[in-house]
Amino acid sequence: MQVFRAVVLFILAGLAEIAGGYLVWQWLRADRSIWFGVLGAILLVGYGFLPTLQPQVWSFGRVYAAYGGVFIVLSLAWGWLIDHNPPDQPSLVGACLALVGAAIILYWPR
């Protein structure tokens, strides 16, 4: 259950960060309404809160380092699904390596 909870929290944090950043980008770079920026800022605050719900046994550094692997995968998925820019083979290999690294950071016996 701890692994499932960690994965769900990482995915929620990643979606909040990516969607928040994307909305701010749309506001500032694509001349969208200021409400895109406001909603983006709210999502980015949510992103900052979600990692604090991870298990107490993990330090800040470990949580954020492992989150980086999940962020890489979610960023590539967002680019593919939202921006219609599919990842190439080296990007997919790199994302898999990042996930392996994230798992080692969190779950390697200490």
Swiss-Prot record:
It comes from the Bacteria. InterPro entries: UPF0060. Its main location: membrane. Gene3D superfamilies: 1.10.3730.20. Pfam families: UPF0060. The chain crosses the membrane at residues 7-27, 33-53, 63-83, 89-109. It is a multi-pass membrane protein. It is found in: Cell membrane. One of its GO terms (cellular component) is plasma membrane. Keywords: Cell membrane, Membrane, Transmembrane, Transmembrane helix. The keyword Aminoacyl-tRNA synthetase does not apply. Belongs to the UPF0060 family. PANTHER family: UPF0060 MEMBRANE PROTEIN YNFA. HAMAP family: UPF0060. This is UPF0060 membrane protein Haur_1798. It comes from Herpetosiphon aurantiacus (strain ATCC 23779 / DSM 785 / 114-95). The lineage of its organism: Bacteria, Bacillati, Chloroflexota, Chloroflexia, Herpetosiphonales.
